[in-house]
């Protein structure tokens, strides 16, 4: 009787399509894909992956999926492999195609939810690599709420040139430096050729590595898995271990919503602050929280920022990459230091079946001597977190600033207004931007773009031209995890819906103050009302297809830019 109950529990969902005489047609089709008589009582596990040679981030995911399916079969489960999409942020950056990046988060979530719900899967493993794979996967996982685990494809190793580590951001910055005459053609070409040596997601604490770190902190990935190199053997071992962990989750009936609590999100935000992670974490964690039914707000990010130091020296503003962090203890070491300081919730459940504190029991609570990737907790890079929530008459619903790696965290200057990224990029490369300017790029928000493009090309060009500490940039679009400088994104309400950013005119004085968390347009209320009365909403840029549909459905960036 015990064995029967266990088997019934393992196929707790799939028995709807495998059991009984009336399901003979279902079983007939399953036999055609490899099921045999003894398999219909087993758990059927969805293995969703985004294998693609579109991008090095995803080029090795199929191999990891093979390791997962093998481990599932060994554990007595039946894997069903299916694909989902990816859009390369790095390759589409600075082009019309970048409008599809954030859209792909929703497509990934919808596709995972659709397939695993439609096929009555008992559990789910998602293997992802590029930026939107992670939040898209976790949104789908949360909606389904079947036992699940996320497997990160792994980070790329750094490239090397003239004794320096390279990442993809090195190339974006080289564009500005070469355009400004500060770099030779030979150096420019060598940086391009050497920056990406193989498979894996972009190597600094950019968006992919930020989100993988957040997922490990939330308890939805195995310890140490978020900073492994994509090409090292331990990544394949970790993938197989994840499959075995999923089988235990089904046995114990541990669901994602048992793990993804408000406390788990607070742990994720705390780790993102400590490692100097991407602004995109704000948008994505809020969207995942929405899928979980967890009330997560911009105020939660600001509250946690104020108490959390940045003590990992990672790119884009720091020196090291994710594989360097892995070598000195990875996310578990960071979490143990935070736990000791009383900044983490140790009682949160994880996919190991144990709590955060139990997972970290044997992890040292101090950084290793002789390295400076992880600094002592009481000697951090910054005493407070680097992702600040700015409000003011230019962003009544809020905006997100990344304030690490800056000599100054405030600027007041004349607005240089552009209604698209392309217009701004042309001005930067044409040397029309000078120190003290505050660039405004608008109509790039979730609805207005549509798709909320990342502004890595203009921010990198600004840095390449030597203006990174003297020019501000404000946008209703997003920033890449590779962005740093005096930048404020996610300005809400966005221009397309008539937000104050739509009313800014060339030469208006704007004050960006990350110290007081204020974003102020120095124009009196009467003048703003006059401009508002004259403002006319622009025509939609797309009337058919996925971008048109997205623009109709998507909400404010201040609430995660969700579509449901």
Curated annotation (Swiss-Prot):
N6-carboxylysine carried by residues: 132
Region Disordered, residue ranges: 1-23
Cofactor(s) needed for function: [2Fe-2S] cluster; Mg(2+)
EC number, UniProt record: 4.2.1.9
Active-site positions on this chain: 480
Binding site for Mg(2+): 89, 131-132, 454
Pfam families named among the record's database cross-references: ILV_EDD_C (PF24877), ILVD_EDD_N (PF00920)
Biased composition (Basic residues): 1-10
EC top class named in words: lyase
UniProt-listed InterPro entries: DHAD_IlvD/Edd (IPR050165), Dihydro-acid_dehy_C (IPR042096), DihydroxyA_deHydtase (IPR004404), DiOHA_6PGluconate_deHydtase_CS (IPR020558), ILV_EDD_C (IPR056740), ILV_EDD_N (IPR000581), IlvD/EDD_N (IPR037237)
Gene Ontology terms: biological process: isoleucine biosynthetic process; L-valine biosynthetic process
Segments traversing the membrane: none
Family in the record: Belongs to the IlvD/Edd family.
Subunit field text: Homodimer.
Protein name listed in UniProt: Dihydroxy-acid dehydratase
Organism: Deinococcus geothermalis (strain DSM 11300 / CIP 105573 / AG-3a)
